[in-house]
Amino acid sequence: MDPINVDFTGRGRDDGKKGVADVLIPPEHSGKKIAINIILTLILGAVLYYFMIPALNFKSIELYLFVVFVCLIYLLLTIISSRAFIKPEYLPYVKRRSRVPGILILALAAVALVGWLTGVTLFRAKSYSKLISVQDGDFAEDVAEIDFSSVPVLDSSSANKIAERTLGDLSDKVSQFVVSPYSTQINYKNTPVRVTALAYGDIFKWIKNTKEGLPAYIIVDMTTQEGQLVRLPEGMKYSPTEHFNKYLLRYLRFKYPTYLFDEPSFEIDESGSPYWIVPIVDKTIGLFGGT
């Protein structure tokens, strides 16, 4: 065990406020334990980042939470490695090792608070009013008349029920997949339709089918109320219902680590090729407001 240095010279005169608990007593092999704690924090932090996937952007509130969690991991490892929870004499040592993480947490909290206050609607109403530019126009010229036979007669809930029935056409794999919540109404070949992606039935069916990907998608005609299953020559390998590296937002995060992403939507082009549309957003008022 490393030697304990205690001042008996009187230079550190007792002012009535210090006690035995204020004597800094490092645990045995403290240097080695610090190195191990740092390495474990980096490893656990990497795992945490993999699952949280925060944008490396000060406008992302998830980034602040991620850094706070990493600091808390280091503090917890310091307490465990020093055994301060059963040996109170090591508490001053833990407090000393906690200074930098503690200061970092307070600094991030201050930055986040100021960033939030500078974006509060009450203080920045004028800025919010300028988010959308207003342009004058002529309704009769800007909005063309449409054929009433092209007016959608289904709502999203009814269209999803038709999609669930249409999934039965995937007879060879119908038990492996379900209709996903990702559906979008678009104009496809001048016809209003709702396109719906598939999802894996459960984790075991994902394990069985993830290599081939999602084999099809469904089109529901919003005027004729007919559903069509469209098989793909190659399955969709990335989607919001995937896991690990094929999870859509994780795949995008590793390619674009600083971007702020909005919710993805599923669409197809005029040739029927499927796409995931993921908007990139920016915060223009304060740190977290004015999307």
Question: Model-predicted segments: where are they?
Answer:
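Soluble extracytoplasmic regions of secretory-pathway and membrane proteins
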Residues: 2-291
